[in-house]
Amino acid sequence: MNAERWDCPCLRWSIDLAGVRARDAALDLFIAGLSALKRGDRAGAEHGLADLVALNRNRAPPDPGQERDQVPDILQKELQALLRQAGGAGGAGGVPADAVALMQEATALEDAMPVEFGPPADVKPAHELLGEMLLQAGLFDDAPRSREII
């Protein structure tokens, strides 16, 4: 993702994700949707989002004493927000208010997660993505507050 090679042949590899954790399958779907969006393939991005929504809808409930893994939900909200932003017709600075609201929901979910060791569980931390969206829209006063939490 950080290389921003949205047309990389590796994105077309068929990888068997049967039996992987929901967060790992969600990461794959998020990257597929995001790369499609970055290539200008809105239908492909919407297909990735639909698959991500289906994954989240069909996840088994957590075991007793365990909490639901929020990473797949965060990734879904991030991809939804990016699609809304790409759709244009926004509010302040060109960012649709519903895209910002989705990102605020994603940041709230992320903030409530326990701190993990190692790299972030999601490929694009929600505060970072919200900050980038606000900066791209020219909302310079709002963006630093979003990124301070990273």
PLM region descriptions:
Residues R12-R23, V53-R68, T107-P119, E148-I150:
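Solenoid-like repeat scaffolds
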